[in-house]
């Protein structure tokens, strides 16, 4: 199964997360929803069987490394000033990334 990492579970992410989860079964996706606010990530995951909600501190290099390496694609829903830190890791680990 393809691993999709969505970093950020705020209001603008909810529609994308809902779409990814709705398509996950037929497309073979596991969607990890990562946010500093675990309750927000859990709420966005909708307890879907193909979702995983995690606490995520974008400033924690080790955690970024672990989660990005596990992923096939990374979607950054973070504020624009935080995209660069994620983008650099995606380049280093040769992972696809998109910013929405």
Residue ranges and their predicted role:
Residues 73-90:
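Beta-loop-alpha module in the N-terminal Rossmann-like domain of NAD(P)-dependent dehydrogenases
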């Amino acid at each position: 199964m393809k691993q999709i990492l969505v970093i950020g579970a705020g209001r603008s992410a909810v529609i994308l997360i809902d779409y990814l989860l709705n398509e996950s079964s037929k497309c073979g996706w596991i969607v990890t929803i990562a946010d500093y606010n675990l309750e927000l990530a859990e709420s966005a995951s909708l307890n879907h069987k193909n979702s995983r909600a995690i606490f995520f501190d974008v400033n924690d290099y080790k955690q970024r490394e672990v989660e990005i390496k596990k992923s096939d694609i990374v979607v950054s829903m973070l504020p624009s000033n935080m995209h660069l830190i994620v983008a650099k890791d995606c380049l280093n680990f040769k992972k696809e990334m998109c910013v929405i």
